[in-house]
Amino acid sequence: MKLKFTHKTWYFFLLCAAAASMLNGFAVLGGMDFSFLEMAAFCITGITLLFLAAEKGSSAKDKRNYFGLFVVLMLSYMGRGWAAYICSALVWPGLLGYEYQKGRPIQRQLQLVGAAEVLHLLFVLLTVYGGMVGLSFWANLLWVLLACARGWAALSLYKMQEDA
């Protein structure tokens, strides 16, 4: 039996990453620390981007763009301060923007994820660097909503792929 990995496989992994992120967000809202789920979501997203970049038969432009998104994701992990938050907020909109550019009808998902990333980034930066600790609940709530938006986008991409 030979395993065949297609875009549909990797979009499923993106859906799993969004689900892990959502579970972590619900745990944080409940006062628990499930940060390992966020690390799992980060790893799944990174692996997915790498495998999308390495897919046999894809164009050089695809490889370059997916690998570039992987580099931005790594910068979000290795970076410090506000730059890391900004790099983190660029990955999913960048991925969805590229998929939209390739002709996938995901304009609404792209708009929702982009808006959710901007709002979440704003609230996180105000909480961490602006000293507005009272906004931390709203930043965490926006994290859950952002994970839901990412999940919807990943599910849409998954459903658009033909069964292979």
Residue spans of the language-model regions?
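Cytosolic juxtamembrane helix at the C-terminal end of the final transmembrane segment
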Residues: 3-5, 52-57, 94-109, 148-164
